[in-house]
Design a protein with these regions (language model features):
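Acidic, mature catalytic/reactive cores of soluble proteins
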Residues: 1-873
Length: 873
């Protein structure tokens, strides 16, 4: 770092650089000391950097002009942070041959050798349309797969808080003077940012969906990290206490579903054509989930790291390329159909279904909220079940439109599917029936056994061959599952709100009992997104949420959970005296002054020995005592009772983790702004669903008012004093009675980008772009003339004069002007060749929409006129 006074202004300049060699630092010092016009050059550099940043944000439609200036700034900020996490394309959908060639070579050396001439004959710059043409006219499945999932993204920085010791990541943003195409991110982060990106780059959706599916595992989970070169996973280090492995659940389903839904709205052919194409790979993550008996015995410790397999893969990467991280058969990547990939993802969740509870968290990781880390093992997620309900309903809609009557899938998957289907059929519930705890246990055991059998067959070996599954079989099974889910959802509607998580008790009995936890914001968000709550009922849920203990009046927003008081230290670990008096073991130990398990403190309270930090330690001590001759019979009679008393005193199974004990981050009293934005999006989706259902105006107004009530709690509607930070910057969370914390790199930005485009009424249906800003506030239209600055499809900074009663934004870098008019709704499309086409109605044709989505440059500007009566708010 260096500094210098600017004599003419009295300003003090600080110059900071990173990643410089000694010679580069010396050269820089020389320039600073010898250059006469150094300040002018610095100003030029700042101006260029600002222009470059504007162009990056503008290329992702981050520039808007409306009467709400702070909202415009917030949209800019959201867009900036979204592309910083997920990256952005360099020039629309253009691909550099040099980077593409290097990508193929790094991925699979054999494929590169085979396709070298084809690649060399490509133009230096070509677009994604050319790449897709290569896919459709080639018979090499490896090349097709690699082409489909290629993403030439730049500017991506992996999300991760560096203060957390387990977060290890690279930040690669330049490569000398050339563009560096690179992306890296946690699976659970980067795909959600790509969901925001594809609004501006819809033609990239097939690549992102392919990258998602190609990286899922045989047992239906996903690796920890994604980067340009493929996948990566956490490696167990026996000497590192932070070293840990596992799989998340909910992210997988809802992130993939949103991408599939987006593709279905834009162009259904990719999904329909891919369902029976064997062009998708499988990640070979060296994690082995234990068998069903081990999981039932200890659901907190269920995954082993295969060190030998990991080392073999690392060695094979040097020989084969990064494709060696995929499932291979004799050094060849094994390919399956999209139908199989989707079926395995679904079956892995359905195999962990616990009726009336949700999806079992038995893969050593929590879900979206890391602070619920202690739910792992005995926690059950209704959140994932709600999302899975929407996912399965969507899959059935897709299957209803396919031409094929059957798909080809692996023998092992087909057997797993059919046996699982029969098990679900055997336990088909009556309407609103809550399953008996004994029957629930046998249902769960059977599902676990089937999943375990499948895993043990497929770990360390490729499929034994292919078989056929009828489409109608899948549809019928999905309908059966949805009936099970409907019961569980209805049974988790408690006191006007829905459960997010439950806990189970499976220790040493033939029953599985389900216990409800306290309400969480996450539960309301996911159920409102599930497709099971109709718009009118959603109004009731949202009103109940505003009346609940989760609502924090000072911030006009919602905490993750109701704020609760904690027991004081001395109030914990107290065994009721009546239990002690009824226990022969407790009385015998106290009489002998044996404090290994129980002792009486100076205040006369009975407590468990402080060293018994969990039930496993207690079991070990009880086992020792059972070897004592005089206590042997007592132990036989009372061991299970003592364990039950221990669990009653400490209630470990209902302990959620940091969320129940800490006050910062995602802890007690904390508002997590990402979840509030998810609530905003769920409410907006229900508003548009109400429009599709032709709901009455009162329902629309109620949902819209609730939407804006939620919106008013977010930062762009607050003062710095209220927010505790700059309102136009996204922040992670706000602890109770404090200001916003952790700026910038939050997943919240994706939801805010999507909801902003929803407010503007940009909706796609079957390939046609519709303009229906029924949710937009009429106060957003300008009250006086202004200028809209934007980046056009030629990457040029442009200005557009706006009048009173207008506003402007871009869509795929084409400026869209909305105008209030008395002449009815109409659309005027201005083409680059000075042709103007007028449309009566609210939508563009498929051809026009395709020109926008493909960023062809044919459309120069679109103007849409609305009557004031169109707007409700």
């Amino acid at each position: 770092m260096d500094r210098q006074n600017e004599q003419t202004t009295g300003r003090l300049w600080f110059r900071e650089h990173v990643n410089k060699s000694s010679s580069e630092v010396l050269e820089l010092k020389k320039i600073i000391s010898e250059e006469k016009n150094i300040i002018a050059k610095i100003n030029q550099c700042i101006e260029k950097a600002s222009d470059d940043l504007l162009k990056l944000v503008g290329a992702s439609d981050g520039l808007q002009t409306s009467q709400r200036r702070l909202r415009n700034i917030r949209h800019f900020s959201n867009t900036l942070f979204n592309i910083m996490r997920g990256g952005i394309f360099d020039n629309h959908y253009d691909i550099e041959k040099l980077d593409f060639s290097d990508y193929i070579k790094r991925s699979n050396k054999k494929v590169f050798s085979k396709k070298k001439d084809l690649i060399n004959n490509l133009p230096e710059i070509f677009d994604i349309k050319k790449l897709r043409f290569l896919c459709e006219n080639d018979d090499d499945k490896n090349f097709i797969r690699l082409c489909y999932e290629y993403l030439p993204l730049k500017f991506s920085r992996r999300h991760g808080d560096p203060s957390r010791p387990w977060n290890k990541f690279n930040i690669k943003v330049n490569d000398g003077d050339s563009v560096l195409y690179y992306h890296e991110g946690n699976w659970r982060d980067i795909f959600q940012n790509w969901e925001g990106l594809v609004i501006s780059y819809p033609k990239s959706l097939p690549s992102i969906i392919s990258k998602f599916l190609n990286a899922t595992t045989k047992d239906g989970y996903n690796p920890y990290r994604i980067n340009k070169e493929g996948i990566d996973w956490e490696v167990v280090d026996e000497d590192d206490t932070w070293s840990h492995i596992g799989y998340w659940n909910d992210h997988q389903i809802i992130y993939l579903l949103k991408l599939l839904e987006g593709q279905w709205q834009i162009d259904r052919s990719f999904i329909l054509d891919s369902l029976n194409k064997k062009i998708f790979s499988t990640a070979n993550v060296p994690y082995k989930i234990r068998d069903d008996e081990e999981i039932l015995k200890d659901p907190k410790n269920t995954i082993d790291f295969d060190h030998a397999l990991h080392q073999k893969i690392m060695n094979d990467v040097k020989k084969i390329g990064t494709d060696a991280r995929l499932v291979l058969d004799q050094d060849q990547v094994v390919h399956v159909s999209m139908a199989e990939k989707l079926l395995v993802l679904q079956l892995s969740k359905l195999s962990n279904f616990i009726p009336d509870g949700g999806i079992w968290l038995n893969t050593q990781r929590p879900e979206w909220n890391d602070a619920n880390n202690a739910l792992v093992g005995y926690g059950v997620s209704m959140v994932t079940l709600y999302y899975l309900n929407r996912h399965i309903s969507f899959i059935n809609k897709v299957l209803a439109g396919v031409n094929e009557t059957e798909f080809e899938i692996s023998n092992e998957v087909l057997a797993w599917f059919r046996e699982t289907k029969e098990t679900y059929k055997k336990y088909s519930p009556s309407v609103n029936e809550r399953l008996d705890a004994t029957k629930r246990k046998t249902f769960v055991q059977e599902l676990q056994k089937l999943f375990s059998n499948y895993r043990m067959k497929t770990y360390n070996k490729s499929s034994s061959g292919g078989d056929k599954i009828k489409v109608i079989e899948i549809i019928n099974f999905n309908n059966l599952v949805l009936a099970h889910f409907e019961n569980s959802i209805n049974n988790n509607y408690l006191e006007s709100l829905y459960s997010a998580y439950n806990t189970i008790n499976i220790d040493n009995s033939n029953k599985i009992n389900v216990t409800s936890l306290y309400s969480m914001l996450e539960g309301q968000v996911s159920v409102l997104s599930s497709g099971k709550v109709e718009p009118k009922n959603a109004v009731k849920v949202l009103n109940a949420l505003f009346k609940s203990d989760m609502y924090q009046k000072e911030q006009n927003s919602f905490m993750l959970y109701p704020r609760k008081g904690l027991k004081r230290f001395l109030e914990k670990n107290i065994i009721p005296e009546e239990i002690v008096n009824e226990s022969n073991l407790f009385k015998a130990l106290l009489k002998r002054n044996n404090t290994d398990i129980i002792y009486k403190d100076s205040s006369g309270k009975y407590r468990f020995n402080d060293s018994l930090i969990n039930s496993n330690y207690l079991k070990a001590e009880l086992d020792k005592l059972s070897k004592t001759e005089e206590l042997k019979q007592i132990m036989i009679d009372e061991k299970s009772e003592i364990l039950r008393h221990y669990m009653t005193v400490f209630d470990h199974q209902n302990y959620t983790g940091r969320s129940g004990t800490m006050y910062g981050y995602e802890g007690i009293g904390s508002i997590y702004w990402h979840m509030v934005s998810k609530l905003l999006l769920a409410t907006q989706e229900l508003y548009f669903k109400a429009i599709q259902m032709n709901e009455d105006t009162d329902t629309l107004r109620n949902l819209g008012n609730l939407y804006y009530k939620i919106r008013s709690g977010l930062s762009s509607d607050k003062t710095p004093e209220q927010y505790g930070a700059f309102p136009y910057d996204p922040y992670s969370h706000t602890p109770y009675k404090r200001g916003a914390q952790q700026p910038g790199m939050t997943g919240q930005v994706k939801e805010e980008i999507i909801t902003r485009m929803g407010e503007l009424g940009c909706v796609i249906n079957n390939g046609e772009l519709i303009f229906n800003p029924k949710l937009l506030k009429i106060s957003e239209f300008l009250t006086e003339s202004s200028t809209f600055s934007y980046v056009d499809v030629n990457q040029s900074m442009c200005k557009l004069d706006l009048n009173q009663n207008q506003l402007a934004f871009t869509y795929c870098q084409v400026p869209i002007v909305y105008e209030l008019s008395d002449a009815g709704q109409s659309i005027s499309v201005s083409y680059a060749k000075n042709k103007i086409e007028n449309i009566n109605g609210d939508s563009l044709s498929k051809e026009m929409s395709e020109n926008l989505f493909s960023r062809s440059g044919k459309i120069k500007e679109i103007k849409v006129c609305f009557e004031r009566s169109h707007f409700l708010f």
